Structures are given as C-alpha cells and as structure tokens.
Amino acid sequence: MLYSVVARKTKNMKQLLSFLAAALFSLGAAASGHGTPADALALINETAAYLADQGPAKTFFEASNPKGRFIHRDLYIVIYDKHGKVMAHGAIPRLVGLNVYDYRDEEDKYFVREILDKARKGQQGPVDYKWIHPLTRQMQAKSAWFRQVGQYVITCGTYK
C-alpha cells in the first residue's frame, strides 16, 4: 500500500516536472522567436564587413561554424560564389564546395538561381521558397535576403 502511494506520487511528480520543463522550454523558444528581415539584413551586413576585414578564408570558416558569430536564433549565413558554389553554410556545412545552382525546393522552384540572378541586378530580396527549419527540422516557408559583395553573394533567410 505504501509502495503504491509513493509510486503514484513519484509518477505525478515526474509528470509535473516534465510539464514544467516543457513550459520553460516553450517560453524560452517563444522569447527568442524567429529572426526578422531586418535581423537577416543586419547579419548579412555584419558578414560583409567581416569579409572585407578578414578576407574570404576566415569568413567562410566562421560562417560555416554552427556555433559561430553568424548564427542568431534561427538565422544563419550562406555564401555562394557567382556560379552557385556554396562557399559557407551555417546550418549544413557539408554543402560547402557543392554547386547548388540547380537545387530546387519541394515545389520545384530554382531558388538559388533566383537569388543569384536578383543579386547580380543589385536586389536584396526576398526570394520565397520552402526549406527545412534548422531548429524544428520541419519544412517551412522561407524568404531569402541577400547582397552581392564582390564575387560572392551573402544570404540569410527568415522563416515564416
């Protein structure tokens, strides 16, 4: 009898602690929120300044570091050369070195082509497409913001 009372209270306590942990996690996630277009453009400008100061090699390394200075909430930097080769990727570093010019999203949209074409014309976005959110691992609508800096296009996307 005593065992069942203790077991029941222990189970209830575990449920309560689990609930509280989930609630705190949710509050933290809600407080951090999604990055905004203004945040994305600021991160692009910060990366461009770093590129001018530190050069391509250090910038590509830092932008591909998942714990680096160019990761903010759900924002990360991707840098392409003018042909669509990934020079840096903050969320999926294994894409570095691959040419993704012909990559398409789940709706068959050639989003990298569109980003590079618009960047060549001096535009900064947005290009809308679908991509996997780095924190939730779910497919989501995304808007890419970008800036051409010399021979590179620095991009950062906001999830909707």
Model-based region annotation:
Residues 5-7:
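Acidic, Ala/Val/Gly-enriched low-complexity intrinsically disordered segments
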Residues 18-26:
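Bacterial N-terminal signal peptides
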Residues 9-11:
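Charged/polar low-complexity intrinsically disordered segments
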Residues 2, 13-17, 29-160:
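N-terminal membrane-sensor/transducer module of prokaryotic signaling receptors
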